[in-house]
Structures are given as C-alpha cells and as structure tokens.
C-alpha cells in the first residue's frame, strides 16, 4: 500500500489531488475501484477516463480536464505505468522444503520440492522431485505434477490436471516500456495464471501470468509440448493445442478450437468457438466464423510482403477478370 505522494515521487509525476490517499493495487480502467490505480494512454480512451471509478489515473496533460478523480500527470504514460507496477509486485523468498503455513491434504510429495507460504494442495495429488510451488498457489484434487515443474506465485490449478516435466506456469510476461533514450523498462506482471480442471499441459510448455488481469486456461484444455502462451491469453473449454504453437499476448481462443503444431497466433487476436487452424499457419487477424483456416507465405521485406498479400487476397478477382478478357480475345 502506497500513498499518492509516494507513487508520484517514484514515477516522477505531477500529482493533482490528495497526496495522502492510499492505493492498494493496480487494475484496468474498467475495473479499478477507489483504492486502485489505473492508466489512460491516448485520447481514444477518453470515455473510459470519464467513466473511471479509479482512485488515481496516470495520464498526460491533455486529458487532465476530463479526469474525474486524482491524477498523476506525466509525458510518457506507459513508462510511468511500468514503474508503478513494481511498487505492487509481491516478492517470493524461496524456503527450503515445505513452509509451515502450507495446507497439504493427502498427497505424495517427492524429495527436493519447494512449497511456499500459504500453498494449498488438494487430496490425492502427486508432486514429483524438484518441483517449485511458490507462495499462495492453490492446487486442486487428483493433480499430477511431474519433475522440474515451476508454479509461480499466486497461480491456481484445478482438479485432475496433468502437468508434464519442465513446465513453467506464471512466469513474467514480455512487457516493456521505452524511455526517451530508447532504453527498456520492464513491466511487473501482477496477474496470475488460472487453470481449470481436466487440463493436460505438455513438457516444457510456458504459460505467462497476466499483466494486470489473469491468464486463463479453461476446463478440459489439452496442451502439447513446447507451447508458449503469452500474458493475458484466454483459452476456451476443451480446446486442443499441438506442439510448438505460439499464442501472442492478449489473445482469446474460443471453446473446442484445434490449433495445429507450429502455428503462430499474433497478439490481440480473437478466435470464436470451433475453429481449426492448420499446423504452421500464421493467424494475423480475428477469426469470427467457425471453420478450418490455413495460411502461410514465405518471408519478404515487409513492404514487398504487403504488396504480395494484396495480390493474393485478390487472386480470385484477378483470375475472373483475366478469364473474361481471354474469352473476349478468343471471340475476335
């Protein structure tokens, strides 16, 4: 918990409001309450600012007149937000063995495991050697955690989940802000990973925690080996993801989707329910209709690639036009 005055000093902001108000955490502009901080970066989000219930908003000067609450005024909003996240990041200190506050029901726990503060492990779980379970993790019943798995602070695992060797759940997402000198400043990720029941996660898969809200893997999802799931992703119930798939940040995958091996889904993409993506495809736009999708082209200079894409997208029209012209020529 920090006062607005302390936060303003940390992020080098001009404070407009009460310096003694205490802030307990960070939330999105839509969900923040009177004890939380949020940020608004750009005029297109002005209406969100006007409707905000946050205790304080990080913003730039041209939005100050629209702010209904306390404000932290800066030039680089995203950089200031990045600095603020580190104030609210919980730090985990690894103990040896099992912390005395952990609540472990009937479970088999192998040697060399680390189990942190306030961990809850359900009935009939099996924890293999060299597993790290950090503070505040909750694990349901009948879950199998195989060797060398790391489940990091605050994450939640449902019932009857299988987690294969080398999996990392709750690692920091890839989020950074740049300063004026183009130096990078990391964003501390404050969300968690929430995994439902009857989920299978293949070896060496990584699932990043959310930036502010949680990364979510719903019930029945099947994930193969070496899959990367970035921060803020939501994967719907009973979807299946084959090996080496990469899912970019803030994607939403619907229910019962099937993603073929080696496919890449770009950040901020949404797939509706019952989508099939062919292996090695690149998904760079929202898929709003059920169906089977395929797409991959060779790499080129970006400007050339964009021209090629325009031609490819219009090949049917071009072919139709050429057929008409060919018939006209034959008729002469």
Swiss-Prot record:
What is the protein named? UDP-3-O-acylglucosamine N-acyltransferase
Q: Give the CC-aspect GO terms.
A: membrane
Question: What organism, scientifically named, is this protein from?
Answer: Ruthia magnifica subsp. Calyptogena magnifica
Q: Provide the function of this protein.
A: Catalyzes the N-acylation of UDP-3-O-acylglucosamine using 3-hydroxyacyl-ACP as the acyl donor. Is involved in the biosynthesis of lipid A, a phosphorylated glycolipid that anchors the lipopolysaccharide to the outer membrane of the cell.
Q: Signal peptide position in this chain?
A: none
- What is a single molecular function from GO for this protein? N-acyltransferase activity
Catalysed conversion reaction: a UDP-3-O-[(3R)-3-hydroxyacyl]-alpha-D-glucosamine + a (3R)-hydroxyacyl-[ACP] = a UDP-2-N,3-O-bis[(3R)-3-hydroxyacyl]-alpha-D-glucosamine + holo-[ACP] + H(+)
Transmembrane annotation, as ranges: none
E.C. number, please? 2.3.1.191
UniProt record, GO biological process: lipid A biosynthetic process
**Superkingdom:** Bacteria
Instruction: Please give the family membership noted in the entry.
Output: Belongs to the transferase hexapeptide repeat family. LpxD subfamily.
Q: Which UniProt keywords apply?
A: Acyltransferase, Lipid A biosynthesis, Lipid biosynthesis, Lipid metabolism, Repeat, Transferase
Q: Which Gene3D superfamilies does this chain map to? A: Hexapeptide repeat proteins, MurE/MurF, N-terminal domain
Catalytic residues (UniProt): 231
């Amino acid at each position: 918990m920090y006062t607005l005055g302390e936060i303003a000093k940390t992020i080098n902001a001009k404070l407009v409001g009460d310096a003694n108000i205490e802030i307990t955490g960070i939330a999105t502009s839509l969900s923040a309450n009177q004890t939380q901080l949020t940020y608004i970066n750009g005029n297109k989000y002005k209406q969100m600012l006007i409707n905000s219930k946050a205790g304080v908003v990080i913003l730039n000067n041209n939005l100050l007149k629209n702010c209904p609450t306390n404000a932290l005024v800066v030039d680089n909003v995203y950089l200031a937000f990045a600095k603020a996240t580190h104030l609210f990041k919980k730090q985990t200190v690894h103990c040896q063995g099992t912390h005395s506050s952990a609540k472990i029901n009937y479970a088999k726990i192998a040697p060399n495991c680390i189990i942190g503060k306030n961990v809850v492990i359900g009935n009939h779980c099996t924890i293999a050697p060299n597993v790290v379970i950090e503070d505040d993790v909750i694990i349901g019943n009948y879950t199998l955690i195989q060797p060398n798995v790391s489940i990091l602070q605050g994450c939640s695992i449902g019932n009857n989940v299988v987690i294969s060797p080398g999996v990392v759940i709750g690692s920091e997402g890839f989020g950074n802000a740049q300063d004026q000198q183009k130096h990078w400043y990391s964003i501390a990720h404050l969300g968690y990973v929430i995994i439902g029941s009857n989920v299978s996660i293949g070896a060496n898969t990584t699932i990043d925690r959310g930036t502010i809200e949680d990364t979510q893997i719903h019930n029945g999802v099947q994930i193969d080996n070496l899959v990367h799931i970035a921060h803020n992703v939501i994967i719907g119930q009973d979807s299946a993801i084959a090996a080496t798939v990469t899912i970019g940040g803030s994607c939403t995958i619907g229910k019962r989707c099937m993603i073929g091996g080696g496919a890449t889904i770009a950040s901020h993409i949404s797939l509706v329910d019952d989508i099939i993506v062919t292996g090695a495809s690149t998904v760079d736009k929202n898929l709003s209709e059920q169906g089977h999708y395929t797409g991959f082209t060779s790499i080129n200079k970006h400007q050339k690639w964009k021209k090629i894409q325009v031609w490819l997208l219009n090949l049917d029209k071009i072919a139709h036009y050429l057929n008409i012209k060919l018939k006209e020529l034959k008729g002469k």
